[in-house]
Amino acid sequence: LIKTKPGNTIVSSCFILVRPSATGENEVLAMSDCAINIHPTEDELVEIAGESAACAKIFGVDPKVAFLSYSTLGSGKGEDVDKMRNAAHKAHEKYPELPIEGELQFDAAVSPRVARTKCPDSVVAGHANTFIFPDINAGNIGYKIAQRLGNFEAYGPILLGLHAPINDLSRGCNASEVYSMAIITAALA
């Protein structure tokens, strides 16, 4: 039986998305939690963010973490907005070395032009590469949109928070994805 590693209370998941960029280097993103936690609490989102940032680093990403919402820094109201804002603040306190922002709309998280308008003082906005979704619905839809319409290769779900590396595969995966996940699991060992 493989349990959570010390200090962790949950298992979560991360997808690593990769596509070639115009500069010739790969664009690499991390998206969480897209496969395990249906409605994570604020504290679970904090743990998911820390684990996702660590996973992103394994893939050469200098994580800039965005807690996603339909609101950017208070532009909207509601329980879901509060949850993401509070989780981002808690994550910033727990991981002060990480650039973390939230709550952010996706456009403010990835577009420098939009970020200059919506949150000009943010270090993360416009440059986010590690995305924390409010729930599994948003996360699963988000990574599949990136994969199918954004031409990203999706690797995952990579299971996070466990004492030993294990992973899962989608029923829709192909042989190349099975091979890649075996390599990823070995790299996590």
Predicted regions, residues:
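Anion-binding alpha/beta catalytic cores of soluble intermediary-metabolism enzymes, centered on
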Residues: 1-189
